[in-house]
Every structure is written in C-alpha cells, then in structure tokens.
Regions:
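Conserved beta-alpha structural segments and adjacent helices that either
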Residues: 1-497
C-alpha cells in the first residue's frame, strides 16, 4: 500500500455490504500512516477511534501522526493511572485529561470533522460517567458575564480542587477579596479571575512562581477535574446505592462517612457506579464512529480483565479475613460488571457501531462478512548481520542500500528518535558517502522533493518499512535496539492490598 496513494474507501462499493474491514500486512511503524488514510477517507464525515494495546505506544503514535499530517486533530483518551480496586484515586492530571477528551468528543459529535481519537485497551474496558453529567460540569465565561464567585469556589472544591492561600500548582485555587485564582489541569498557566460583585471583569494569566500577570484572556473554559463531583444529589445517590449494594454501613466505614459529609475520599472513584444511576461506555460517548483495533488489542483486553477479576477477588478474600491485610480499613468492592466491560462486550460494541477495522502485520484469511485489504507493507531491512560481521563496514552497507533504493526510483527517509541521534547518524552516513540529504519535518515535504534526495526526520518508529513508494530506514534498523530497560511487575495480591 503506497504511502502517497489513497485506500479507495470513500465509496461504499469498495467495501461491499461488509462493515468489518481487516487491513493486513501493516508492518510495525506503518500504523500512523494507515490511520491518516482512514481518517481522511472513511472518516471524512467525522472522527475515527484507534484502540492501542498499551499506553506506552500513544506518545510515539502522536509524534508520527503529527509528522504525517500536522493539521489532523488528534485526541487522547487515557486510562486511569492506578490499579483496579486500588486505595488511591487516579492522578489529577490523568482524570482531567480523560474528562477534557470526553468533552471534546461530545463537541466532535455535534460538529463532526476528520479527527483521530487515540485510546487504550484499559481505557475502553472501563465505564464512564454519562455524557450529560460531564456536560453539566463544564464552566465557561467571558469578561462581562454574570458569574457568582462564591458558587464557583464551591464548585471547585466539590470537583477536587484544593483551596490554598497562594496558587502555585495544578489543581489549586485561592480567593482573595474579589479575585479568584485557579490552576486547572491541562492549562499552560493559572488564571486570575477579577470580579466586581457577580460580574466577571477580567481574565488574566499569571506566572505561578512570581504571581505576575503574563497576559489577558478573552474566555476561560473549566472542564471537570474529577469523574465525581460531590454535589448534594450525587451524595444522596451514593448513600442510597451503597446501602442497596452492601447493606447498612458500619461505624468504621470511612468511605461512607466521608462521602456523607461531602468530603473527598482517597480511591472513591473505584465506587463510581454508586454515584450515578447508570454509567456509559466509551462507545456511548463516541457514537457510531469507526473503531480501529491495533494488533494484539484482544489479548490486552483479556489480560486487563483478568487483572480486574483477580483484584476484585483479592478484595473479597481480604473482607472475609482470608488474606494478609485483612485487619486494614474495610474495603467493599463493587462487582466488576458494574464498572468494567468484558472483552466480548467491547467487541460487540465496536461491531454495533458504524464500522470496525482491524490492523494486523500478518496475512488475514478470507472470511465471509468482512473485507480484506492488503497493505503489503514490509518490514524494513535490518543490518543485524552487518553489525555482527567484523569484516564489513556497517555504515558503508547502509549507504549502499540507500543508493540501490534511489537507483530504483524509490523515495528514502532516514528516521531517528531524537534530533541529537539524527544529527550524529547523518554525520556518520555523510562521512561514508551519503549525499543529497535534506532534513524534513512533515511527510508532504518528502512527497514534494525529487527522488534523488534522501530525506531525514525525527520519527518515533521502532523499525523501518517498505511501502513501495517510500522506504523508511530507521535508526534501530542500523544500530540495533535502544538500551531501555523497563521494570517488570510482579502481581502479588498482598502487595496490592
């Protein structure tokens, strides 16, 4: 599948009656290029959602997507950054980014346009607050609008903001006379709201270190910071649902006491179903947008759901006194099905939507009910043999390979992970005879340049690929694996509890 050509999916005749597409032969590193084609063609009337197997791939995908199509909107819906049934809440930044993404998703449904929603297997398994409940918590105002400062301060406290004397960190707010300072997650700078009575007079950004004004703003939009807002209605709903699920609370039930008093409790998000009459899924928020599955997502969904069930059962054993830590603060877990989908439910939701698309590096067999599209993108050449050989110059072999590709009329892009590593790599290749190298920052420049030029870019791909009209030679293909060691997790229930 050439990089610079269309997939040919704009017409329904290209798909037949099938709404399930499998694109096979998608080599590692080509996913972002394929996503852009999908977003531009089948997503022409709205966004597409891409589910990746783990969150570590998201940042790399975002970087490559910005190279392939800088103007394509990309939205990231992260998962909670804590374990299932944990005693701690998800981080404030992760929660705020989730809610900001859901609010943006709601706007995309109202005014559809091509965009890519990146999310993970962990994120799609977990249920979410209803769309209407999130929309009710969004606050926006301009200078001259009527806005009750005391009501705003109360809403900030209920939403998880910490009241302080001087705002310096994200998630803090302060009130001094007719001035309210707040630092919202996701904001580049904190804001200073100046009130005259119930009228918002001005909005100014300021430096949290010096407290000095850095500029003015025409508007501020405050997204919810937490998936739980301790309003009187929500507290009442929690109390009713808690008693219905667990029976009358005991005196030592710290969770029930804290929520009843309107105080936030560490880890209360793990009882999210008790705060709402009904939770939504990611697919409810997304509507009928096409859903694209990364390779191995099903395995990631199964692994995560197994972890959810394991941790739930560990909490039950703890409550029954059969587990180390049983003398700790009581923990009454909600059933997994109230907070999480199963892998099969995720599959059903995806298939019930507008279209399901699977990406795989392998060949896919023809099966009734789905359309197979052959990407025919191959993994790039590895220079492992040249690295191991003592009588071969590695970089001369790379230069020779690139020369052969250019002679065949192929466009070549040399990719590295950082500016520094790219500069060093190009310097060495130049010393070994590579000529006409031009650094680029977007794919359109690669397309516009003549084929006799070799382009180079910072690109977060593990390995290169051959897409026919473009060959990417990656830093890792030449120099070998990067020396990054990731700590291994050991799943021990007693450590979790």
């Amino acid at each position: 599948m050439p990089v610079f050509s269309k997939l040919g999916l704009k017409s329904s005749s290209a798909l037949g009656a099938n709404r399930h597409i499998v694109i096979d032969g998608v080599a590692d590193g080509y996913e972002a290029f394929c996503l852009i084609r999908l977003a531009e063609e089948i997503g022409e009337r709205g966004p597409i959602m891409y589910i990746v197997r783990d969150g570590q791939r998201i940042a790399d995908l975002e970087q490559v997507l910005s190279f392939v199509a800088p103007d394509m909107p990309v939205l990231h819906l992260p998962a909670w950054d804590c374990l299932p049934y944990d005693r701690v809440s998800p981080g404030a930044d992760a929660s705020a980014r989730r809610l900001a993404a859901l609010s943006a998703l709601s706007q995309l449904k109202k005014a559809p346009h091509p965009a890519i929603i990146l999310t993970t297997a962990n994120a799609v398994l977990q249920k979410l607050p209803p769309e209407a409940a999130i929309a009710e918590q969004v606050i926006s105002a301009r200078p001259g609008n009527q806005l009750d400062m005391n009501d705003l301060a109360s809403r900030l406290e209920r939403n998880g903001f910490e009241r302080v004397s001087t705002v310096r960190d994200i998630g803090e707010f302060a009130v001094r006379g007719g001035i309210l300072d707040l630092y919202a997650p996701g904001a580049e700078e904190p804001l200073r709201l100046d009130f005259f009575g119930d009228t918002l007079e001005s909005i100014r950004a300021f430096d949290p270190a010096t407290q000095r004004t850095t500029g003015t703003r025409k508007e501020f939009v405050l997204q919810p910071m937490s998936e739980i807002t301790l309003s009187p209605d929500m507290i009442s709903r929690f109390r009713k649902n808690y008693v219905a699920m667990f029976g009358a609370p005991q005196r030592d039930d710290a969770l029930y006491q804290a929520i009843s008093e309107g105080r936030r409790f560490a880890g209360m998000e793990h009882w999210l179903p008790l705060f709402y009459d009904k939770l939504d899924t990611v697919f409810d928020h997304a509507g009928n947008m096409p859903v694209v599955f990364d390779h191995l997502v099903h395995e990631a969904l199964t692994e995560r759901h197994t972890m959810v069930v394991d941790h739930y059962e560990a909490r039950l054993r703890q409550a029954e006194g059969k587990e180390p830590g049983s003398d700790a603060v009581p923990y009454k877990p909600v059933k997994p099905e109230t907070l999480y989908l199963t892998p099969s439910e995720v599959e059903k939701h995806a298939e019930a939507g507008g279209m399901r698309i699977d990406l795989t590096p392998f060949g896919a067999p023809e099966v009734t009910g789905r359309t197979i599209i052959h990407a025919d993108v191959h993994k790039g050449r590895s220079f492992a043999e040249e690295r191991a050989a003592t009588d071969v110059n590695l970089f001369e072999a790379v230069v020779k390979h690139i020369a052969e590709l250019r002679a065949a009329g192929r466009k070549v892009l040399v990719a590295a992970w950082t500016e520094g590593s790219l500069d060093r790599l190009l310097q060495v290749l130049d010393e070994h005879g590579l000529e006409k190298i031009e650094s680029v920052d977007r794919l359109s420049t690669v397309k516009a340049l003549s084929r006799d030029k070799v382009t180079a870019a910072v690109l977060a791909v593990e390995s290169g690929f051959d897409a026919g009209d473009l060959v990417i030679v990656a830093e890792q293909d030449i120099l070998g694996d990067r020396l990054i060691r990731r700590s291994k997790r050991r799943k021990r229930d007693q450590d979790f509890i």
